UniProtKB/Swiss-Prot annotation:
Binding site for UDP-N-acetyl-alpha-D-glucosamine: T15, G16, G17, N127, R166, S191, I245, A264, L265, T266, V267, S268, E269, Q290
Descriptive protein name: UDP-N-acetylglucosamine--N-acetylmuramyl-(pentapeptide) pyrophosphoryl-undecaprenol N-acetylglucosamine transferase
UniProt keywords, alphabetically: Cell cycle, Cell division, Cell inner membrane, Cell membrane, Cell shape, Cell wall biogenesis/degradation, Glycosyltransferase, Membrane, Peptidoglycan synthesis, Transferase
Catalyzed reaction equations: di-trans,octa-cis-undecaprenyl diphospho-N-acetyl-alpha-D-muramoyl-L-alanyl-D-glutamyl-meso-2,6-diaminopimeloyl-D-alanyl-D-alanine + UDP-N-acetyl-alpha-D-glucosamine = di-trans,octa-cis-undecaprenyl diphospho-[N-acetyl-alpha-D-glucosaminyl-(1->4)]-N-acetyl-alpha-D-muramoyl-L-alanyl-D-glutamyl-meso-2,6-diaminopimeloyl-D-alanyl-D-alanine + UDP + H(+)
Native species: Pseudomonas putida (strain W619)
Amino acid sequence: MAADGKNVLIMAGGTGGHVFPALACAREFQARGYTVHWLGTPRGIENELVPQAGLSLHLIQVSGLRGKGKLSLLKAPFTLVKAVLQARRIIGQLKPVCVIGFGGYVTGPGGVAARLCGVPLVIHEQNARAGTANRLLVPLSARVCEAFPGTFEAGEKLRTTGNPVRPELFMDAQRAPLGERRARLLVMGGSLGAEPLNKLLPKALSEVPADLRPEVFHQAGKHHAPITAERYQEAGVEAQVEPFIKDMAHAYGWADLVVCRAGALTVSELAAAGLPSMLVPLPHAIDDHQTHNAQYLAREGAAFLMPQATTGAAQLAERLNEVLMQPEKLNTMARTARRLAKPSATSTVVDICLEVAHG
């Protein structure tokens, strides 16, 4: 454990969308000489990623309430009180200079515990529509960080920081001009793959004239890659189909255009990489937050927002034809995306934490 005044506690869990920005900030804290501790739950992705990063992981027992049965709802107050007490004990032992929450079920009880312990609390919201825990923690927080403007009501506590993303994504890709080669299309469905995109893209690309058709790299997910490759073959479209993308910086650097979902981190990475996109938000995301994320890029002309319910192969093919016939349009979208990026997000979030920690 670090000497007094050098511990920081990060709260983040559940999904990569919460954990990866938190890890970026953890590395920045460490670079400034702080020891980072992590508060999570036993079921989230943090159980794998945080120890891999060499950080101390502390666990509390808490889960979400949406969609639970009556018995779980009746138990909820007792479960939450227990989780707050667990978090308060951990905070009391660590004595961090500040606590920062990035979302996930752990953030609610952890944030309350921070307030009870008198430790400054900072929250960071990755999505354009704030999650329940972060909305409830605003009154308890010393600072509120939002990735996208307008997520929270304006106030003295609020800072628009952007999402912390990997610094290598901001490097300019060395590509030949579009007019001198075929365009390159990157299709991403997340680690599990997005089956609607896996079905849609082969059909849509078959309707793009062969002389205009781009090179295709399609990340289809572990269980969907073989059948997706078959669909491309049946459609007469050449494509490289893979279950995962191991090097996202390389994939972004290769691409001229991306078709994907609109998770908060993905949207921020597209801006960082300066990539135009066609965003198909996950239709059943909580509070429809992916649509709100997509609007951040679409409103400024850096992306096309294409709702899944109204986007078929014909509509997607029409949009692809439109931009592939106008390389300068893609270039303009790319410049707009890069303008919307927040390259200093990680250092800004850490600056805010240390500002409230040390006055």
